[in-house]
């Protein structure tokens, strides 16, 4: 069967996994749409999106409209005559006009087992909620937010130590392979999508940096999940001597004390009392420092038993 003309729409690192899988597959990526370059860092230097960088490495034309709804962008997309548009974390809403351009529609790679965790931050929300599994869903796009019928899914387990970064990488790898396999099944088997269940719908709100601030009055298990989910961004953090202290690699332990109180200092970690139970912290990152083991940090700074974290 003739290779399909694919237009890819995506922006962050997560989307590069699917783009690379398409480039390695049997279809032809004729163009990429991604968000405009943005100034970053102290020097405000313009930075290309990860998807743009990968596309340019392969000589693929790149389009970066401020709004995909603009007439110029719609005209450009129509001129590409796509058989299918593949969308992965693009960051823009696709209008009905855009959705109707490709012959076989627009297909989305979403990092959750829909209908659970529709929305912007499904990876972190799944860990925060204590879900035992996540996954990737390939769906046909419609105007609603992640509401389209589903072609296929793949499941990824989440354990007590899975971080947001680890789950991101696992789903990024799984999503690319599943998308290529699904496109082949649509072409060769006439695979049709199934309507999403009406039960079990949840929404994954966009992450905000301030969500990382630890509330020590919460149960230890909830704080541990936040430490996992927010690694590597936005990072769970507390205040120590009035400065931010990022927390990593935490585990729930038995312990009692005033929430935020350091109740035990060990050679390779420290234990903080929570609203219910306690949290052992194995890695930290102090302001202006690199990430390090808690043992290394303790040798240099010496947080004392009885000190309170979270106080400005």
Curated annotation (Swiss-Prot):
GO molecular function, one term: methionyl-tRNA formyltransferase activity
UniProt-annotated binding residues for (6S)-5,6,7,8-tetrahydrofolate: 112-115
Paired cysteines (S-S): none
Catalytic activity: L-methionyl-tRNA(fMet) + (6R)-10-formyltetrahydrofolate = N-formyl-L-methionyl-tRNA(fMet) + (6S)-5,6,7,8-tetrahydrofolate + H(+)
Assigned EC number: 2.1.2.9
Keyword Protein biosynthesis: yes
Gene Ontology, cellular component aspect: cytosol
Keyword Protein biosynthesis among UniProt keywords: yes
A Pfam family it matches: Formyl_trans_N
This protein's UniProt keywords: Protein biosynthesis, Transferase
Record HAMAP family: Formyl_trans (MF_00182)
Family: Belongs to the Fmt family.
Protein role: Attaches a formyl group to the free amino group of methionyl-tRNA(fMet). The formyl group appears to play a dual role in the initiator identity of N-formylmethionyl-tRNA by promoting its recognition by IF2 and preventing the misappropriation of this tRNA by the elongation apparatus.
Protein name per Swiss-Prot or TrEMBL: Methionyl-tRNA formyltransferase
Organism of this sequence: Magnetococcus marinus (strain ATCC BAA-1437 / JCM 17883 / MC-1)
Gene that this polypeptide is encoded by: fmt
């Amino acid at each position: 069967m003739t290779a399909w003309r694919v237009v890819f729409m995506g922006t962050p690192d997560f989307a590069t996994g699917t783009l690379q899988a398409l480039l390695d597959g049997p279809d032809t990526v004729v163009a990429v749409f991604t968000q405009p370059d943005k100034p970053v860092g102290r020097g405000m230097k313009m930075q290309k999106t990860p998807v743009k960088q990968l596309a340019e490495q392969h000589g693929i034309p790149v389009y970066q409209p401020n709004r995909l709804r603009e007439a110029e962008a719609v005209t450009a997309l129509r001129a590409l005559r796509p058989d299918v548009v593949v969308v992965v974390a693009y960051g823009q809403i696709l209008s009905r006009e855009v959705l109707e351009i490709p012959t076989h529609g627009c297909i989305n790679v979403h990092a959750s087992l829909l209908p659970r965790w529709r929305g912007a931050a499904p990876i972190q929300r799944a860990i925060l909620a204590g879900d035992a599994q996540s996954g990737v869903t390939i769906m046909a796009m419609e105007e609603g937010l992640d509401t389209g019928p589903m072609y296929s899914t793949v499941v990824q387990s989440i354990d007590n130590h899975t971080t947001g970064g680890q789950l991101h990488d696992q789903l990024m790898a799984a999503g690319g392979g599943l998308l290529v396999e699904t496109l082949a099944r649509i072409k060769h088997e006439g695979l049709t999508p199934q309507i999403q269940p009406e039960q079990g719908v949840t929404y994954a709100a966009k992450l905000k940096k301030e969500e990382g601030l630890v509330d020590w009055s919460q149960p230890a298990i909830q704080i541990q999940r936040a430490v996992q989910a927010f690694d590597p961004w936005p990072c769970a953090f507390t205040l120590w001597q009035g400065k931010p202290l990022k927390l990593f690699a935490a585990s729930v332990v038995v312990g009692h004390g005033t929430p935020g109180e350091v109740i035990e200092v060990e050679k390779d970690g420290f234990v903080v009392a929570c609203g219910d139970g306690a949290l052992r912290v194995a890695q930290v990152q102090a302001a202006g420092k690199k990430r390090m083991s808690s043992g290394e940090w303790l040798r240099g700074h010496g947080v004392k038993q009885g000190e309170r974290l979270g106080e400005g």
